Amino acid sequence: MKAFPVICLGFAIFSSSICVNINILQQIGYIKQQVWQLSYYSQSSSSYVVVKLLPNIQPTDNSCEFKSVTQYNKTLSNLLLPIAENINNIASPSPGSRRHKRFAGIAIGIAALGVATAAQVTAAVSLVQAQTNARAIAAMKNSIQATNRAVFEVKEGTQQLAIAVQAIQDHINTIMNTQLNNMSCQILDNQLATSLGLYLTELTTVFQPQLINPALSPISIQALRSLLGSMTPAVVQATLSTSISAAEILSAGLMEGQIVSVLLDEMQMIVKINIPTIVTQSNALVIDFHSISSFINNQESIIQLPDRILEIGNEQWRYPAKNCKLTRHHIFCQYNEAERLSLETKLCLAGNISACVFSPIAGSYMRRFVALDGTIVANCRSLTCLCKSPSYPIYQPDHHAVTTIDLTSCQTLSLDGLDFSIVSLSNITYAENLTISLSQTINTQPIDISTELSKVNASLQNAVKYIKESNHQLQSVSVSSKIGAIIVAALVLSILSIIISLLFCCWAYIATKEIRRINFKTNHINTISSSVDDLIRY
């Protein structure tokens, strides 16, 4: 068993340059899935491909007359005539008409274009520009018409490379011409009719958009493949200086073609192919990861790391690749889409679990397992893992975030009723107990809208209920408060009345006593006065 603990080649302790530790990341539910070689491309040049759709037939000793060729020629003429007329209408506006417009000094028939987008007008401009290469096209036409070779290169004064392809001629050269003198004319005619009929059917199928308007419809991958036939690898290698296979270049759609001319007399089609310039960055890898849920601190969580990263040497970036074209082994981009990663994210990628961030699962539909090179990595605490061969349940300990199931532990695995056959051994040579603090789990996942809305609605209903109860209580408290206020006021008034009465009584008592005292003094004075008067009289 092999172990792949890291992807990059070095480790910088005192810098932010850190390697990706595949082993540790897999143990917390972050699994490497696909690695692409990063290449950049741009549409920088073009080439013309002359396709001869009617093969040359060598003369035979018995001078066979092939009716199939005549019929094929007639059918093909009917097929190509609309394309030729359409191209002529776009490239050559009517002599007496002013209904045309100039783009970069080129006259284009607007009536032939109809309603067109900017990209379609650009394609029409390209088509008209191709007409200026009439001398080169004529040279290619004359060169290919007399030859039986499947690929022929013609260079004119402009030094533009043109590759003449004869897909049917390649079939005629290898099969038909070697048997011309050994078979009867009828047999040869039947075989030739079969080959031509199949090829015509294929052309009719893949060129259907071009029959409508070739200037506004680029040639599809299937059409290019049909035009080039078995010579596709040779054409790609002759026009592109790259070691990338022709299949990947065509599948990525990097080669775009457009019909620029149809020569009905010679049954030839001239296609302009935009040739990209491809540059491969040898030390740049784009890596795809799949995140599955893991069992962290007694709850289902998922790690917060980018799904795709770019690694150049021992540096990592987030790499969305939104405008890139992916094939089996390569990713083609027109520019670098790299985004910086924080130091904590890089440390987490390096296997420093204490720097990783997890978020609890908010919804029920979560990826809980993934296939990895013939093995299964699953969160067996959140789904049922049952081995059927041999038959036993698979238990995931608390200190394991996920479980890796390979051929040594199970041959037929059932995950919540889904059966899988395990065919490989795991390349992980060790597993360690993971310790993750509670502070590393934060809510960063998008919420489950339906669940949260139901909670909000329930909270609102409860709030309305509580508000009604509160209003009722407030009303009760208000009435009670009024009654209490009246009682208090009555008591206060009564007390004040009693106090006032007491004060009045005290004042009356004091006043009465004072009046009596005054009266007593007055009577005493009167008595004295009377006594004095009596003394005076005596």
Curated annotation (Swiss-Prot):
Post-translational modification remark: The inactive precursor F0 is glycosylated and proteolytically cleaved into F1 and F2 to be functionally active. The cleavage is mediated by cellular proteases including host FURIN during the transport and maturation of the polypeptide.
Annotated site (Determinant for fusogenicity and cleavage efficiency): P95
Disulfide bonds: C324-C333, C348-C356, C380-C385, C387-C410
Any one annotated GO CC term: membrane
Keyword Cell division: no
Keywords for this protein: Cleavage on pair of basic residues, Coiled coil, Disulfide bond, Fusion of virus membrane with host cell membrane, Fusion of virus membrane with host membrane, Glycoprotein, Host cell membrane, Host membrane, Membrane, Signal, Transmembrane, Transmembrane helix, Viral envelope protein, Viral penetration into host cytoplasm, Virion, Virus entry into host cell
Topology with respect to the bilayer: Single-pass type I membrane protein; Single-pass membrane protein
Comment, domains: The 2 coiled coil regions form a stable six-helix bundle.
Subunit record text: Homotrimer; disulfide-linked F1-F2. Interacts with host LAMP1; LAMP2 and LAMP3; these interactions promote the cleavage of the viral fusion protein F.
Name used for this protein in its record: Fusion glycoprotein F0
Organism the protein comes from: Mumps virus (strain Kilham) (MuV)
Lineage: Viruses, Riboviria, Orthornavirae, Negarnaviricota, Haploviricotina
